[in-house]
Amino acid sequence: MSKAIIVVDFAYKGTQRKGHGTGRKGLSSTLKYLQYRDKVQNRLAANRDYERWQDRGMGIHWRDIMKNSDALQSKHVLAWTWVISPAPDLMALIPEAERRDLVCDLTERIVEDYYLERGFGVPEYSYILHDREAKMEDEGETMQQLHTHVVLPGTAPLDGVDRAAVYNNKERGHDVLFREIASRHFSEALDRIVGPEWQLLREEPEIEPDQPAPNDLDAWFPRS
């Protein structure tokens, strides 16, 4: 199996608190962490007027997002939280000045297409871009890992009704759809910016069958 070109995942915060990290308290803690976790390096992050969140309807501050999550929750889901993380080795092929805009553009395309392909209208959402150093499994070196955290409501617009509950179930193939959409958009971006040669980083090495030594006649031509 070839290595993934982009990692995506979804999780949710339920409407009821059922332990540590769940319910409204769990969501508010997560939002605060996402908003302020790099404030040592980026002191503007603690400023109410600093737009760290990219607002597509849920707000530019954790309090706004919390308020909108309350208003747009479903019976069981207060908010969905996504992670979208393109592979660092492939992102390294992108000119540095273009990387952040690319990840933001990818995030918006993935959100929009996922909901449209599920039959919903595009819901309100907000996302935040994080930048960290990640250790690569194979090489042991660290590389820049740009990724986004997306917060979406428990409901979405649906034709014929005002809004409907959204559930993401692996058993129904929603995770496969999520990965396919993300991979499609990232591969198209790589083709456009880098060219098809990026695919060389994802080709599986050919495994040659063990062959006998050239002078081993018994192996090539077994004795009768």
Question: What kind of feature is each model-predicted range?
Answer:
Residues 1-224:
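N-terminal nicking endonuclease/strand-transfer module with a His-rich metal-binding environment
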